[in-house]
Every structure is written in structure tokens, then in C-alpha cells.
């Protein structure tokens, strides 16, 4: 037991809590990498994009890994915006507005996109139309992805940002040392509060993102049957 633990008997418990929260944060980060790569694969395959897959930087900091995901998502948003603009140019205004109408049936939207998708992509597939309907101008890009980008940016600039993602494998003391070194001996309570605050936001945003991209993948499978 460290000497300070005699003065602060709750410190061992706090160390364990930091360890647990750190692992949860890494799990969320890992999931975001996987889901982003799944989305990248769908866009490359069905919308003709040439987006690069991303990989978690095991020797990097939490901020560096957040930035990798943010950069990938920003590129995805730009690609979807290009397709959205192309749809707007090719479709009659009334038809384009139907794509934005949440009350409009998805099958009707796919039929609308199917009319012009070959002009935009050079080929027309129902899978491409389904992906476009699910992602272009939808709440996925305007809300869910933007929210996750915002959450990741906040995590990156927080006191957690400078902590390495690999410190977990080095033991609890290394995590604590990394935290204390990063924030000049800020108490463990502050670290725990920061983890809890950001994890609450991250888990919520990540879950919505995961669900949305799973829906896109499911829609593609339906069209390929």
C-alpha cells in the first residue's frame, strides 16, 4: 500500500474505479472505430466512395484516437454532402423534399433515388439507393454523427485526452501516474468525475451511432436478397 493510502484510505477504491472507467472508455472508442469502418465499407462498396479505413493507435493518447475517428467522420460527412447536393440537382424540388420528409415511406424514397442514382454514380442499384436514403440528408449525418464528433472532441480536450490508451495493460498505478502527471496531481475524484461525465455522453452517442449504422447495413442486406 502506498504511504498516501494511509492518509487517504479511499484511494485504493478510487484507483479501481478509475481502472474500470478507463476500460469502459477504451471499449467505447474501440466500438466507434469498428462501426466507422463498417460505415466506410458500405459507402465504398455502394456509393463509390474511396474512404480509408481507420485503426486504433495502441501507443497513442485518448485524444489522438478521438481525432482519428473525428477526421474519418468529417470525411464521411463531406462525401454524403456531395451526394446530397447531386440528388438536389438531379431531382425535381418536390421529389427532393420527399426525401427529407420523415413521414414518407422508405420504399417510396428508394424509388425516387433509384431514378437518378445512375447519373450520380454511373450505375443504379437498389442497395446504393437504400444507403443514400438512410444516410444522405438524414438524422444520421445531421444529428447522430455530428453529436458523436462533438462528444469525441470534448473528451480529447478534457483531462483524459493526454492519457495513453495502452496504460491499462501497464497496471492501475500507471494509469494514476499518467492522470496525475497530466493534470499536475489533480485528485482522483476529479479524474473519476471526468470519466463518468464523458462516458455518459459517449455511451449514449455511441449507442445511437452503432444502431444507425446497423440499420444501414440491414437495409443493404434487404436490397441484396
Swiss-Prot record:
Predominant location of this chain?
A: membrane
Tell me the domain of life. Eukaryota
The protein's UniProt keywords, in alphabetical order, are: Coiled coil, Membrane, Transmembrane, Transmembrane helix
User: Which residues lie in coiled coils?
Assistant: 69-92, 182-209
Cell compartment(s), UniProt: Membrane
Give the transmembrane ranges.
155-175
Question: Membrane topology type, per the record?
Answer: Single-pass membrane protein
Q: Which InterPro entries match?
A: DUF4533, SMCO3
What PANTHER family does the annotation carry?
Answer: SINGLE-PASS MEMBRANE AND COILED-COIL DOMAIN-CONTAINING PROTEIN 3
Please state what the protein is called: Single-pass membrane and coiled-coil domain-containing protein 3
